[in-house]
Amino acid sequence: MSREVERDSIIPMCGIVGHVGPPTPSERSLTVLMDGLGRLEYRGYDSAGVALAGPGGLDVVKAAGKLDNLRGALAAAPPAPAVCGIGHTRWATHGGPTTVNAHPHRAGSIAVVHNGIIENFRALRTEVERAGRELVSATDTEVVAHLLDLDLAARLDAAGEALDEAAVAVLLVESMRAVTSRLEGAFALLAVTSLAPGAIVAARRSSPLVIGLGEGENFLGSDVAAFVAFTRRAAEVDDDQVLLLTADEVHVWDEDGTAVEPATWEVSWDASAAV
């Protein structure tokens, strides 16, 4: 199946989009996220949300129903200018189509969006609850957010000293690799942390994820429709790979930690076709 026809053959499922922009906070990430979510509406959804990261921390805004409901929530409580963001449109699987169950899910410094189904989430949820965490949703994704936050916190404690944002982002890569090695099922996961707001860490297994390569900004999406309005340069993410996205760099590793160079291509259709 070619990359150009794959978009039209996907069955309804969650849509995800990510953006990392220049270090000066702005509305750019929110603009990219909302445009991308609009172009992913063809996948079907029953709720939507965004998480935006900047020097002031994380803002998470979400709503049940259509994107207009999310736009209304954003107008009622505008998020601070950001340097990075992740967005999601959800088809309910674990947990009903409510605002609480909508993505992104937050745990401590972490916010996560997810496309897929974590088959062993009940056992992992019990583990998270025994660690003293209170979960507010019925979703498998919130469990992953807590696992990432717990793992990252342990790595930060083990470091024994204050780390800069770049070092924290690398630790989040290690946390993502450790957590996803324990997950059973299919997933495309995007995570941001208020401790390193200029980065997205992501991973995939049996669920679509594509990189968009920009100039001074980079993108992620369930498919190229999520970012084709901003760049036509795309790169593949293979199964069980983990990646770190900043405004100027994209790093991809296999599950054993070996750095890889992703295959790239030019998208042949323009944004007018992705509506």
Ranges and model annotations:
Residues S2-V275:
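Conserved short alpha-helical segments that host acidic/polar catalytic motifs at enzyme active sites
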